[in-house]
Amino acid sequence: MVIGNRVLLPLTKRYYNARYRKVLHPELREEIIAHNCYCEEVNSKLHFDDEKIDPGISLKTAVPSYDKHVMLISDINRGMAKKPGVWKNIWESRIENNTTHPYDIISKLNFGPGVLFNAISITSSLESFAPTSLEFYDFLVMPDMRYYRVKKPDIEKFSQYINSGHAVAPKLSFSDYLSGKAAATTVSNNNQITLSLDDSIYYRELKNDAWLFVCGHEKRDMRCGIMGPEILHSVNTANSKPLVNNTGIISHIGGHKFAGNILIYKPIENQNGRKKVDSLWFGKVTPFNVSEIVQSVNEGVIIENNFRGGLSL
């Protein structure tokens, strides 16, 4: 299975994270009824039968194989103000088909197959970000835990820096991967020299705090477009204080039939001076169970019912 240009791998021991205790959540009758009713409500807004959510479908344990995640920040001002989001009105089914800023730079980003790429719209954060400017392109990068601000002439330099240690990706379409014509694998390029950035590219270290992203790519899949904002609203309002300080909507991360889908990045203690971040993927998430899923992660517990898989980056 693939998403974008990433191979989805079954959950194996390589991706099992021993830092978490995995538990099966016993589903109470009231919870099952609430879940089914919510799915029916979402289905009533969908036009085609093949879009309908099946609440009884089994969740597959599969995650993308990657070791770096580059996220293009979309329209910071509007996202942070919680006005109608770019994920609803601006993001085309294929993000690269957008010709306006900042998406016009995507064709210039030639990342290796070990690099996952998405667009995001930040909805809340303890971080401060510069206002959207046509002169710059803004990125979050995991596990670097950095915010980068790059001018257009420096995009190639930025790509080379991100690609340090990776083979350059071939130019392939999403349909190539769906049809099996191409196989994307994580490749380490032993001849690649690790590059450093000069002063022409601004970056800032992020606070050592978790991030939560919810797929809300409406023009790619209406299910996520409906559920994503509702799930985020629940995360931010279910308790007296937010369960996660940094949240956003993310473009296509696969598994639409398992909507809603969330991705949590949780920093862990540095090992040998190197930053480490846990990447945790969950599916079949609704506004009714997301708080428990996130709270459990905060406490070092993974609810296995909703766990798609994870990696330590």
UniProtKB/Swiss-Prot annotation:
<comment type="similarity">
    <text>Belongs to the AIM32 family.</text>
</comment>
<dbReference type="InterPro" id="IPR036249">
    <property type="entry name" value="Thioredoxin-like_sf"/>
</dbReference>
<dbReference type="InterPro" id="IPR009737">
    <property type="entry name" value="Aim32/Apd1-like"/>
</dbReference>
<dbReference type="GO" id="GO:0065003">
    <property type="term" value="P:protein-containing complex assembly"/>
</dbReference>
<dbReference type="GO" id="GO:0045454">
    <property type="term" value="P:cell redox homeostasis"/>
</dbReference>
<protein>
    <recommendedName>
        <fullName>Altered inheritance of mitochondria protein 32</fullName>
    </recommendedName>
</protein>
<dbReference type="Pfam" id="PF06999">
    <property type="entry name" value="Suc_Fer-like"/>
</dbReference>
<dbReference type="GO" id="GO:0005758">
    <property type="term" value="C:mitochondrial intermembrane space"/>
</dbReference>
<dbReference type="GO" id="GO:0005759">
    <property type="term" value="C:mitochondrial matrix"/>
</dbReference>
